[in-house]
Design a protein with these regions (language model features):
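Nucleotidyltransferase catalytic core that binds NTPs
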Residues: 1-132
Length: 132
């Protein structure tokens, strides 16, 4: 089944995360998509700066928490950190079956660190993906 997905490290599940996951479930149910949470095996800051931030949860605790909200897929950040936003979105669409990407209001991804939501929307239109 095609996916609706969100991406983030999600160390601990706070109110903002729960709101995002509720939207993920509503949209998945309405459009018959698999709710999917993409997260990373290690915190991106650890690989980018060499310093791991203090964690609220262990890997296993985080997995257990996130599984309450959808299928959880751990990505190797080192393997995807050089991808631009467009390359990463193409990977999600073509290799993972992601039809819709749900983003938080201040979320950024890709080695090019696009500045705003409208830039991700432009890429989504180009590759035939929905973004919200």
């Amino acid at each position: 089944m095609p996916r609706i997905a969100t991406i983030g490290f999600f160390d601990g599940v706070h109110r903002g995360h729960r709101f995002l996951f509720a939207q993920l479930h509503e949209h998945a149910k309405h459009h018959q998509l698999t709710p999917t949470i993409y997260t990373f095996d290690r915190h991106p800051k650890e690989l980018l700066t060499g310093q791991a931030p203090a964690m609220l949860t262990t890997h296993d605790e985080r997995k257990a928490l996130l599984q309450n909200y959808g299928e959880v897929i751990f990505l190797d950040f080192a393997a995807v950190q050089q991808l631009t936003a467009e390359q990463f979105m193409c990977y999600l669409k073509e290799q993972e079956g992601v039809e819709t990407l749900l983003m938080g209001y201040d979320h950024h991804f890709g080695s090019d660190r696009l500045k705003g939501f409208h830039e991700y929307e432009k890429i989504a239109r180009k590759i035939g993906m929905h973004i919200e």
